[in-house]
């Protein structure tokens, strides 16, 4: 896969990557295809595997993928351990056209039916179930969408009803893309990325009405969060320093980051994310676990290991060991999920 400026589409191919109907295949081959595709992200349990089938089409629009899928009742889950193992990190913006999805992690009650919008964040744990279904899903890299969101880390398993006008607008756009992309070449399809991502952001940001005071608070939060993201590895970064920098009280700063578990929690989460990337990158293979922890704000290796394991379900050493298997296979890092998904039809 190319870098952030690249495209998943092949210059000599249309935006349609593949069209698969497993009813034309033996059951074993159908299940193998599902393991390769859905199983690349999720652990799944199919209620009646003997009757399994899926019909799917995947299209490419620059750096994003659009998938149409018909399949049978099943449960899908994505654990913190798996997140730490594969490092995949993107959003799934999904509309159920038929059937129903239900959240299953026990934290919140949420379900979606025909026309409703569901958002999944592959950097966070997932547990859900679906009846026999038809859905359309946009797979969007985090680096494209997160900077445009007011709350980029609060979208996982979020459901917004079909009666919301912005949801209706986005749904019409996505269905229009699905119908139009097969007739476009790679260059034309890539032009649709920016307006699509901006419409997603507008929908997710605009579905909760804010009064003026909440709007000001959101603007303050976004400004401070951006500063933290840019200076997250600075040794002097602290709650007190941020309060002085932005001229607000410690109490107000704590309030702004209450949904993140506090300022210190947000800083640690960002540092752990960067540390995980470093552990998986062969260019940093010469560094010890303790050195990587120190570079990312952890003075003591045991504290780094404990925080990392609590977040990702595995230790830094286990994460590096898994990455090393990939290095030994001659690859610098795990193939991007988008790269793999764009080539299932080849």
Model feature map: region roles:
Residues 55-61:
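Short acidic-hydrophobic surface loop/beta-edge motif
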Residues 86, 217, 268:
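Short, conserved glycine- and acidic-residue-centered signature motifs
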